[in-house]
Amino acid sequence: MKRTYQPHNRPRKSTHGFRARMATKNGRNVINRRRAKGRKKLSV
């Protein structure tokens, strides 16, 4: 059986990357929450 996680950088960045997050209001909320929490990495 094939495992579920087959990493590829392009889809990873296009769905979870900083630019993708900033593109929508909810994504900006995610970034702001992570900033408020003091996360070292805001996105992948």
Curated annotation (Swiss-Prot):
Residues 1-19, 31-44 have a biased composition (Basic residues). PANTHER family: LARGE RIBOSOMAL SUBUNIT PROTEIN BL34M (PTHR14503:SF4), MITOCHONDRIAL RIBOSOMAL PROTEIN 34 FAMILY MEMBER (PTHR14503). This is Large ribosomal subunit protein bL34. Residues 1-44 are annotated as: Disordered. It comes from Sulfurimonas denitrificans (strain ATCC 33889 / DSM 1251). It comes from the Bacteria. Keywords: Ribonucleoprotein, Ribosomal protein. Signal peptide: none annotated. InterPro entries: Ribosomal_bL34, Ribosomal_bL34_CS. The gene is rpmH. One of its GO terms (biological process) is translation. One of its GO terms (molecular function) is structural constituent of ribosome. GO terms for cellular component: ribonucleoprotein complex; ribosome. It holds the Pfam family Ribosomal_L34. Belongs to the bacterial ribosomal protein bL34 family.
